[in-house]
Every structure is written in C-alpha cells, then in structure tokens.
Amino acid sequence: MIAMSASKAGYKTHLYCPKGDNPAEVVADKITHGEWDDYNKLVEFSNDVFCATCEFENIPSKSLELLSNKTNVVPSSIVFRCAQIRSKEKEMAIKSGFNTPKWFLIKNTDDLISSIKNIAKEGILKTNSLGYDGKGQLKVDKDSNFFEAWENLGSVECVLEEKLEFRREISLMYFKSLDDTEGFFPLSENYHENGILKKTSAPAYL
C-alpha cells in the first residue's frame, strides 16, 4: 500500500524483501531480494534510498537499527521496537494517559493461573511478539482449557486481554516529517472480521 501511494505521488520506490509473493513488486522502481537479517544486502539497500519505512512492524529490530545508522528510518527503530511487543505498546499507552482493557503478561504457568482468575467472562490470549492481524491469538473464556490454548501458541510469552464489546473502532493517524512538521490524517473507521482488518473508511462518519 505504501509503495502504491508513493508511486502515485511521484516518488521512486526501492523495495527490500525476501523472495516470494510480494504485491509491491508490481509498482516498485527497484527491488532487492534478501532476508531481513542479511546485513550486507541491507547496507547496499540503504545506500540507494533517502528514506526507509516498513509495510508492517515485525522486521528484526537489529536490522532497523542498522538501517537507521545508514539512512533515515521512519518511524524510528525505537517506535518499531515498541510496536513489536504488545506489552510495551500497552505500557506506553497507559503512560500516555490512555485506557486499555484489563490485561496480564504471561511468562509462565503461574502467571497464567493468576490471570485466569481476573478475567470476567471472555478474553483473548495473544503472543507478546510476532502477532499480526488476527495471527498469534486465540479467544478464550472461563470454560476454555487455558493451558492447551497457551501450548497452541507455542508456550511463548503472551498477554491475556479481557475481551470488550466494541460498537465502533476509529483510528487517528499522526505524522511527523523529517523537518519536524507535525499533523494528523483524517479520522478513519475500521471494520474487522474474526480479528482481521477488512476495510478502513476515511473520513469516518461520526
């Protein structure tokens, strides 16, 4: 989506990605195929671009830090690192004054047992990292086998969130340019099916 929008705006785009089914390749002006941790290819890529960004957040933080030493990475590698860890996202939101659903960090079976007691009815068990758009998460309730659900997610570090019923979901996107110009894009509304984003409409109709 970023490459398509950039192309329409007249920018030249250079895509870095592993080989595979990459939709952006049809609009990119240049393509470099490489693994996310191929540091030599990342350096070559960085030498050819003025600014680098990511279509999704789960790029290894070390790779983004390497790029940030060679070219402009936006948002910064610090922001991406926070977005990769669900518990860090929630802690940042709370620190910034936002409310979050009740949630618990699960590192071991003791954490899991303790958190179950504090969930009212339904919850969502999510991997703390590498989850994306409905992946790495399972719905659970008081009758669920929480240990089986945790095992199905690989018994990795997770967060358990209390499930809330939403009437609507809206997003407000903030931007900051390299010259420190700041602003907001129009308010948008998101529509999900089974935890996966299906459509976003902007501006939102409130």
Kindly give the residue locations of the regions a language model identified.
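A generic structural signal for alpha->beta connector loops
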Residues: 10, 28, 70-71, 97-100, ...
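ATP-binding N-terminal substructure of ATP-dependent carboxylate-amine bond-forming enzymes
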Residues: 1-84, 88, 110
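A conserved helix-loop-beta module that forms one wall/lid of the active-site cleft
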Residues: 70, 76-138
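Internal nucleotide-binding/catalytic subdomain
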Residues: 136, 140-206
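Short glycine-rich anion-binding loops that position phosphate/pyrophosphate groups of nucleotides
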Residues: 57-59, 129-130, 175
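CheY-like receiver
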Residues: 44-45, 92, 115, 149-152
